[in-house]
């Protein structure tokens, strides 16, 4: 039998196959491969002595580290302008991860009843990213996102409290995902999604819901000099630098620095580039 892993909890895998869900508690001969099955994987499994065993996992087209999922087309990055306030460094890390894995990132600014900062909106639109404003009070705004991801597998990501579960409640009318109020004491959203789970919206469309988190490591990059390849707006200018190895920091005749001075590159994005660069560099030292 063949199916898609839709949930994994403590070594138990739930596989959806032909409208049935099978609970797989053992890995069988697949255990020898030392490859951990992930939500989104296509698994081949068999029944043996009343249990279902995974025999193999089909080749993945991609794999994310956090959230840890496989075979996705879109990374839906959900943020909100306030409560919790938008974390642009985290957003830029998500974008780097998406670019690295050749996954289309879609930025969703939820709770649009709170006025979005046009600077932030235009900053990402102008470099070619899709940005949607959504609100649970505006069904049409969420419907536009659904139309954009139809026929594909998308993963919801972002900090706690930005409204991912509210979006899921709309997108998947037959499922109920618990939503909690913002914790005013900590001024952080309470995490209500406890595990990664894939939901089928229709026969061709799936959404993977994930727990919220407030940090993201760029462990998939081995060297800090790799980072520049995944900053989208750099691509237009990088071949105009004097040195091919230019890191766009202190090198002479750097086209990126020139474009920064001319305000063709966002100072906010560039500052986040420097922070990510130093973070990767510091980790490599140790």
Model-flagged regions — what are they?
Residues 1-9:
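Structural detector for short beta-strands of small beta-barrel domains
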Residues 11, 34-43, 47-50, 59-75, ...:
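Helix-rich effector regions associated with P-loop NTPase G domains
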């Amino acid at each position: 039998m063949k199916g898609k892993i839709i949930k994994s909890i403590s070594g138990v895998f739930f596989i959806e196959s032909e409208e049935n869900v099978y609970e797989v508690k053992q890995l069988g001969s697949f255990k020898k491969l030392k490859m951990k099955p992930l939500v989104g994987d296509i698994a081949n499994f068999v029944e043996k002595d009343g249990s279902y065993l995974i025999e193999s996992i089909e080749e993945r087209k991609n794999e994310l580290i956090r959230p840890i999922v496989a075979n996705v087309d879109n990374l839906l990055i959900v943020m909100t302008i306030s409560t919790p306030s938008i974390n642009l460094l985290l957003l830029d890390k998500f974008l780097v991860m998406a670019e690295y894995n050749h996954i289309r990132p879609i930025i969703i600014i939820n709770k649009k009843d709170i006025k979005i900062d046009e600077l932030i909106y235009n900053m990402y639109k102008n470099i070619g990213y899709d940005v949607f404003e959504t609100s649970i009070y505006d069904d049409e705004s969420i419907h536009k996102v659904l139309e954009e991801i139809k026929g594909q597998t998308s993963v919801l990501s972002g900090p706690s409290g930005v409204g991912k579960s509210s979006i899921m409640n709309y997108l998947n009318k037959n499922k109920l995902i618990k939503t909690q109020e913002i914790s005013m004491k900590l001024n952080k959203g309470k995490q209500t999604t406890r595990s990664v789970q894939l939901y089928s919206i229709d026969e061709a469309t799936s959404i993977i819901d994930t727990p919220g988190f407030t940090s993201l490591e760029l462990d998939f990059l081995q060297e800090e000099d790799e980072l520049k390849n995944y900053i989208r707006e750099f691509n237009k200018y990088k071949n105009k630098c004097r040195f091919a190895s230019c890191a766009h920091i202190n090198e002479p005749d750097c086209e990126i620095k020139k474009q920064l001075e001319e305000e063709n590159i966002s100072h906010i994005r560039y500052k986040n580039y420097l922070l990510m660069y130093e973070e990767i560099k510091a980790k490599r030292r140790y």
